[in-house]
Regions:
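A detector for short, charged/polar N-terminal pre-domain segments
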Residues: 11-22
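Intrinsic disorder/low-complexity detector
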Residues: 5-7, 37, 54, 74, ...
């Protein structure tokens, strides 16, 4: 028997860059993982968001192709 305790089912989301980069808060909104910039700011400042496996507390952190954001059991892959 296996017991998996995830907040929500694992999901991988890809965001294709339209520009050179996307900011972390915008990426969370674009992926549909938060409803607003205010919520994005709170979860980021609370240390709930990882970028490439490291806690990131800057909402304005620029994300480039190849980077991975993790939040609430989900992964966002930034694609060029």
């Amino acid at each position: 028997k296996f017991n998996f305790h995830l907040k929500s089912p694992f999901l991988m989301i890809k965001i294709k860059l339209k520009d050179e980069f996307i900011k972390l808060g915008q990426a969370l909104k674009a992926a549909g993982l938060v409803d607003s910039g205010v919520v994005a700011k709170i979860v980021i400042q609370d240390g709930e968001v990882l970028v490439n496996g490291e806690v990131e507390t800057r909402r304005g952190k620029k994300l480039y192709g190849g980077e991975v954001v993790s939040f609430d059991g989900q992964e966002i892959h930034i694609v060029k």
